[in-house]
Amino acid sequence: MKPMGRREFLELAAAGVAGAAGLPVLGGCRKSRPGMAEAGGLDVAAAPSSVADAAPPAARETGYFVENFGIDEATLRRTIAEGLSRGGDYAEVFLQHKTADGIVFEDGQVIDASVRVDLGAGVRVLLGDQTGYAFTEDLTPEALRAAARTAAAIAAAGVRAAPERLVRRRPEPLYPQQPLWLPVAPAEKRSIVDRVGRKLAAGDPAVIKASVRFRAEDDVVLIANSDGVLVEERRPMTFLYATCTAERNGRRETNWFSRSRRGGPEFYTDDLLDRIAAEAVRRTLLLFDATAPEPGEMPVVLAPATSGILLHEAMGHGFEADFNRKGISIFASRMGRPVAREFVTIVDSGLERDHRGALAIDDEGTPGRRTVLVEKGRLVSYLHDRISARHYGVEPTGNGRREDFRFPPLPRMRVTFMEPGPHAPEEVIASVKKGLYAVDFSNGEVTIGAGDYSFYVKTGFRIEDGRLTAPVKDVNVIGNGPDSLSKIEMVAGDFELDGGTWTCGKNGQSVPVGLGLPTVKVSAINVGGVRR
């Protein structure tokens, strides 16, 4: 049997999934980015179709990429050596094979279904703070070395030897390490979507439109680098996003609810599917009774779980080390100094088992860990990738992340949250004479340098005389992240991690994240009018 080319492999692999599913196939797209080079080609590949077709090594290696594509340790070491051949002080290979299938259901029928296969490698070479990067969608040894030569062009100061051997790490699994979605019958995936769609449509006579988006991924990555590290893991992911539109007296409202997890079909119990539909309907109908509060500066109480988006966006990005290394973040000169009250502790963790933002290893091969950013009100750490950790003389925190093999890693959040505090939720609300209780947020903007933010509260409630009263919607809240952090007056003990479909964008890259919060009182935020 002759080796299959990459294009042939993609067509056969995707057809195998979609043929069973009766779904159209979308192959992996080519997406070049400014400042990045693509090496190799799409048409020529020599990846063996099975391990049996490859010449067996003296000591048989195991692992996904050696068994399926013939990329053994020797190939990885030669690629790393090529990356170091012009004077770089670090080289890294990132391999990825991801199959993702999606279904879009609208008004009682599937309107779109697809399978996408991404397969490729990125090679990065560092020289101090400088980065050379190239990617290829061809996994032959020749194409990998060509990508390494392209990435190595940034350096020309001699040759550093590649490691004599790579030591395979086996990270403690935080999510299942076997294929979860490829074996699932198409009818089972369709039934998940059908159930939510039916429940949405039947949720209330006012519902006029029901939409469901479903996605399931089986993703495998491998990282090998010039420090001798070799690590490989599976990263399952799924989400279901339900949108409801209702109409009353000629007025329409739309809202949504979603759940996501690093898991398989067992995640979608009947109870969860029914809850997703019911919540989307409930949140939509609530908007018919919502009004706009009076504008002005007032206390804002952030509800548990979903309000963590404000922490993530308005404050979390300011803790990412690249922004601090470059002097962009307002926190760049505040390490070790108080930034909040003593009952405020903020954490970013990759260890939240099965959570959307969990990572047993980051995209540089650093093991996942729990990083305390603000401890008892004092800033104690940034979020580091390898480059920023070098700059600050600290260990990487496991936050080097990338969208896929086409991109170099950056410091990114994983699951970011505030720990529980000493107050009772009822006590927090009772302390407010007149203010806003913010529940769900929609789109917003953040200026990383100054930390200024503007967000829309999709749903919330007025606080009047220490009680929650009338619902409000689409209210603009405007503030400054560091200022709001310093104005946190109370933190309750009712901490929740949110299980929604959160995706964070930075420098053109999107990655899945998680967030959470207990009930939190900020003494003053500027509240604007209803968005038109």
Question: At which residue positions do the language-model features occur?
Answer:
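N-terminal small-residue-enriched
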Residues: 2-532
